[in-house]
Amino acid sequence: MIKDCILRYQRVLGKRVHDQPGYDTHGLPIEVATEKLLGISNKQEIIDKIGVETFINKCKEFALSNADKMTQNFKNVGVFMDWERPYYTLDPSYISSSWSVIKKAYEKGMLDKGTAVLHWCPRCETTLSDYEVSEYRDLEDPSIYVKFKIKGEKNRYLLIWTTTPWTIPSNVFVMINKDYDYADVEVNGEILVIAKDRVEAVMKEASITNYKILRTYKGSELIGIKYEHPLREFVSAQTKLDDFHQVVDAGNIVTLTDGTGLVHSATGHGEEDFTVGQKYGFPVVMFVNDRGEFTEEGGKYKGLKVRDASKAIISDLKSKNTLFFEGKIVHRYPVCWRCKTPLILRAIDQWFIRVTKIKDKMLNEIEKVNWIPDWGKSRISNMVKELRDWVISRQRFWGTPLPIWICERCNNVMVVGSKEELESIAIDPVPNDLHRPWIDNVRVKCNKCGGVAKRIPDVADVWFDSGVAFFASLGKDWQEKWKELGPVDLVLEGHDQLRGWFFSLLRSGLILLDRAPYTSVLVHGFMLDEQGREMHKSLGNYVEPSVVVEKYGRDILRLWLLRNTTWEDAKFSWKALELTKRDLQIIWNTFVFASMYMNLDNFEPDKYTLDDIIKYAKIEDLWILSRFNSMLKKVNESMKDYKVHEMTNYLINFLIEDVSRFYIRLIRKRAWIEANTQDKIAMYYILYYILKQWIILASTIIPFISEKIYKSFVVNAKESVSMESSINYDERFIDNELERAFEVAREINEASLNARAKAGIKLRWPLAKVYIFIENEDTLAKVGRIKDVLISMLNAKDIEISKIEGFKSFSKYKVEPNRSIIGKEYKSMSPKIVEYIENNRDIIAMDILNKKQHVAKIDNFDIILNASYVIISEETVEGFISSKFSKGIVVISKEISESEEEEGLIRDIIRRIQFMRKQLKLNVLDYIEISMKVPEERVKTIQKWEEFIKSETRASNIILGEAKGDITMDWDIEGESYIIGIKKST
């Protein structure tokens, strides 16, 4: 919806918008879902039971079906994009274009094959990149201490700790830090080598109290010591590794936060183990296959799943008396982000793109991008600083095939950059569908020896697909289109995509174009439940958008979401949706009011222009016009940085607070006047002008209700509000001084309401006079400019505006001794000081206010009294009520005259009659006849105000006596009974 709002906004600005939607259709999630549909559970079954061709077709069918469902969901909430022309990453043209990135990486010397220890999913039988290892579970694993016997010594052992017993069969060497202090520790007649600083913790964990440190020494003394592998007789392959079983220095890789300070190292199952092993020339030992099972070389453990093998390994260690201690540990362990299987580390051959070569360029390009909010830049920069080479190959089926062919004769590597290039060198016909298994059958002629080259079986990391969208989505001739459209103006996704899509786009852009492919990145938050938890069906807190749409409609959902600060998570709230519904009702009613009165007066907006009528506008009309243009200006500034939430709040708050709750209340009486005066025409035109432009802009947020309002409200409307263009703000009509004056007026109104409440004076009762005292000349001038508006707002006969000094005639000072402070300071003298203050209040107050202090002579002592000792407050004189606002004070009389009370009563009666008109669903032009039964003492009052009542209620006649009509109601007004009947005049 955020994307949709931004695209709609750019359209109403008159811009040509590239709004092609797209779907990532490859990858493990679709493979796993397809496996479930086919009733299979592993990779081998795809090959043996289903067949790769059938499986690929089913994956494609599943992906396209889900894409269609997503399209309908997007359309349902008003997402307006080019749905007839989406891109799919499975399209042959997309795959063909994407190959150009891999070809470019090869040409730059960034693509090669290498061995590395990587996370591997034994269920999915594929590797995972670092950024794919993002999901963890709390798992319970063994926590064991194992004794490695030192060769040539009778009872001396290296003590190691591990939580992965299954890696011990692949052990090659032991790592230490030569600069640490180590100790020979005697336990039960055996000598254990442990880092000195870990002895106490290890013995405590093993519940051993009877031990003795025989000596301590530097780790350098251990370097080169050889040991016997504890499982040598169970794993025959270990007999070939005897020469490598020794202690080596690994520096700070070895820590003293846990373990023993000696680290068992399996070069095939640990990244640091692999790195250190390479440094010392040790072999890469890995006895585990793609399914996570021990191979033939695993000896006794052949065929066992590695995690299952741990139990057997521990049992064998016990039998050989090499298990020192066995415990359990619950720790955060990485699982496959798709199937949730615990991952393992394996040393495997993979294809890499050496992106570390362009790390500095990436960081430079990040600086050039507009990141919204700013913290997006620091997060992605920190990630790039820790960048590692990209493992691009995956051992799966449903993905973009890697365009790498290797000659069977000379091992020459050939990388293809497009389908067209492949066709030019292919020995076999190139299929239209570039997926496996069809692409696997295409051989090419080696450009080095003329031999036959075959494609490697791997597919690309699924993030490769999304990372090339900026150009691959443009089709076959993407180079020409990119010249016209590139770079991408905006990329928008959730904050999780900083390490996902945003990064993969950046990476591909640097490889292909030597620059970031985008100029701005906007990050959005996620939907949480009311407690701030992530929504999951498994937690029972997930709310389907369709349920919200069914209950409240699309626009309410859109408005509520778009109001939330874009990059912050939003807490779902039914109450917030209900409040949003009320706001939409206010918006609707605002247009109903405008339409009704304009239609009644046959107002024709196309006969006028703003420049023509502006000279007839009243001060409140100029104010709303200024507020509108100021709002447009703010929207314009906010949307330069795509701050959708700011635009949404500016638009909605303007219509509700400025137009509906303020301006319309000010102009309602003018709209009721029969004659079409020039100022009334000006009022109508300005209201029409701002509402028309408002609904055009609002269509970017609430398109459904905007479409309905637009077609019924706008004269000579186009086919759709989406075909309209928005105007820019006009500086000529922005009057900041006037806006500030009205802000003060609103404060004055609030202060007046507060004063009325204190005095118990109803709002409908007019005030004879309101006194307004202003603190500074500038504000005084502003308020003076809108005196007539204030009279109407305050329901006053007159107002008097003057400087703050004038308030003195309505105030007096209340002076009280601060007894606690005086008592602490003056002890025994305090009663006399308090008495003095109470007897000299006025002079003390004047001195402190004017001179900051008053000097009192008490018992021949000069006592200096200031604001710490004397509490001075200002009170309003008897008969009046005051209320403060930020720029001054409002004063009203507590007393209401008989005439004012009468007018208040009449207004209460009018309000009841207008309510009854609504109950009869009368048109605003319809006349009525009124009959009333009122208290006898009120008859003369009604007769006195008869013409006023008739004009305000559109009544042709008022009869006092028995109440009758089309509707009759009994009203209690100020404790008196008024029975009122009305009927439509014939």
Swiss-Prot record:
Its localization reads: Cytoplasm
Which interval of the chain is the signal sequence? none
Cofactor dependence is on: Zn(2+)
User: Would I find Cell inner membrane among this entry's keywords?
Assistant: no
Q: Which GO terms describe its cellular component?
A: cytosol
| CDD domains for the chain | Anticodon_Ia_Ile_ABEc (cd07961), IleRS_core (cd00818)
Positions with a binding annotation for ATP: K537
One GO biological-process annotation of the entry reads: isoleucyl-tRNA aminoacylation
**EC class (word):** ligase
- What Pfam families does the record point to? Anticodon_1, DUF5915, tRNA-synt_1
Q: Where is this motif: 'KMSKS' region?
A: 534-538
Instruction: From the UniProt record, list the reaction(s) this protein catalyses.
Output: tRNA(Ile) + L-isoleucine + ATP = L-isoleucyl-tRNA(Ile) + AMP + diphosphate
Q: Which InterPro entries match?
A: aa-tRNA-synth_Ia, Anticodon_Ile_ABEc, Ile-tRNA-ligase, Ile-tRNA_ligase, M/V/L/I-tRNA-synth_anticd-bd, Rossmann-like_a/b/a_fold, tRNAsynth_Ia_anticodon-bd, Val/Leu/Ile-tRNA-synth_edit
Principal location class: cytoplasm
Q: Name one GO molecular function term.
A: metal ion binding
Which Enzyme Commission numbers does its entry carry?
6.1.1.5
Q: Which UniProt keywords apply?
A: Aminoacyl-tRNA synthetase, ATP-binding, Cytoplasm, Ligase, Metal-binding, Nucleotide-binding, Protein biosynthesis, Zinc
Q: Which domain of life is it from?
A: Archaea
Tell me the domain comment. IleRS has two distinct active sites: one for aminoacylation and one for editing. The misactivated valine is translocated from the active site to the editing site, which sterically excludes the correctly activated isoleucine. The single editing site contains two valyl binding pockets, one specific for each substrate (Val-AMP or Val-tRNA(Ile)).
Q: What does this protein do?
A: Catalyzes the attachment of isoleucine to tRNA(Ile). As IleRS can inadvertently accommodate and process structurally similar amino acids such as valine, to avoid such errors it has two additional distinct tRNA(Ile)-dependent editing activities. One activity is designated as 'pretransfer' editing and involves the hydrolysis of activated Val-AMP. The other activity is designated 'posttransfer' editing and involves deacylation of mischarged Val-tRNA(Ile).
Question: Quaternary structure per UniProt?
Answer: Monomer.
Per the record, the similarity remark reads: Belongs to the class-I aminoacyl-tRNA synthetase family. IleS type 2 subfamily.
Question: What protein does this entry describe?
Answer: Isoleucine--tRNA ligase
Q: What is the lineage of its organism?
A: Archaea, Thermoproteota, Thermoprotei, Sulfolobales, Sulfolobaceae
